[in-house]
Curated annotation (Swiss-Prot):
Biological source species: Corynebacterium efficiens (strain DSM 44549 / YS-314 / AJ 12310 / JCM 11189 / NBRC 100395)
Keywords: Ribonucleoprotein, Ribosomal protein
Domain of life according to the entry: Bacteria
Disordered: annotated segments: 126-184
Protein name per Swiss-Prot or TrEMBL: Large ribosomal subunit protein bL17
PANTHER family with a match to the protein in the record: LARGE RIBOSOMAL SUBUNIT PROTEIN BL17M, RIBOSOMAL PROTEIN L17
GO molecular function: structural constituent of ribosome
Amino acid sequence: MPTPKKGARLGGSASHQKKILSNLAASLFEHGAIKTTDAKAKTLRPYAEKLITKAKSGTVADRRNVLALIPNKDIVAYLFDELAPKFENRAGGYTRIIKLENRKGDNAPMSQISLVLEETVSAEATRAARAAASKQTADEAQVEETPAEEVTEETAAEETTEAAQADEAPAEEAPVEEKKDEEK
């Protein structure tokens, strides 16, 4: 008897696994996020990402290939017309898996798989933002340095007046000390 090479199948047979993945992908595209077991979520991720990549190209052949995998025309139309344009700037990583608590009945590990619909930030945009932030902090540092110089001038002037007062005070105290010495 030949040994299995692919590992365990979802649902037992290969045909059942195909149907499970088709239904899970349809639900994911329809709702944006679904809650399922870890094994199903990990198996669904590459399947759904390949479908989204085909939807991004938007050709008739790709649409027919996706229709062969997901037989619901409404969901395929939604995938090609509304979801694919949202992923135009993203090169991959269209889905996200978040671990949840284990299921209550059988303690199965659960996950939420969802579509990542946030806008991607290009490396150039982050560099530009960092450059703008560094320029702003440099400008603030120059603004802070100018008042600091003025403050040092004021404190220097105060120190000179205090020094002058200190010079006068020992002169006044000196005769008092001499008087004490004279009294003895």
